[in-house]
Amino acid sequence: MESLMRLFLLLALLSSSHAGPKVTLQVKLTETFQDKTSQNSSALDMLQKICLLLHLPSGTNVTLLHKGPPHYLTCRA
């Protein structure tokens, strides 16, 4: 879990208002983490945490791409 927090902090540093209207962050996940996100509820929980940790504005679309079907979430304030 600690390494996951480090990843989110790194993403927070990479996402800045200077990046423009559209920013794409691509992160390679470990196989163990990918296995955990294969469940819909855990994937959506993770996407919601990303919205909160990165302070993404309401209406931001977040997509998790992995071996299975993609998961989508629109951040809400």
UniProtKB/Swiss-Prot annotation:
Keyword terms: Cytoplasmic vesicle, Glycoprotein, Golgi apparatus, Secreted, Signal
Broad class of the protein's primary localization: secreted
Protein's name in the database: Surfactant-associated protein 2
GO CC term (a single one): Golgi apparatus
Origin: domain of life: Eukaryota
Positions annotated as glycosylated: N61
Protein purpose: Putative surfactant protein.
PANTHER family the record matches: SURFACTANT-ASSOCIATED PROTEIN 2 (PTHR38500:SF1)
Tagged with keyword Nucleus: no
Tissue: Expressed in lung, and specifically in alveolar type II epithelial cells.
Signal peptide: 1-19
Signals that turn on the gene: Down-regulated in response to LPS (lipopolysaccharide) challenge.
Gene name, Swiss-Prot/TrEMBL: Sfta2
Modification note: N-glycosylated.
Cell location: Secreted; Cytoplasmic vesicle, Secretory vesicle; Golgi apparatus
Short name of one Pfam family: SFTA2
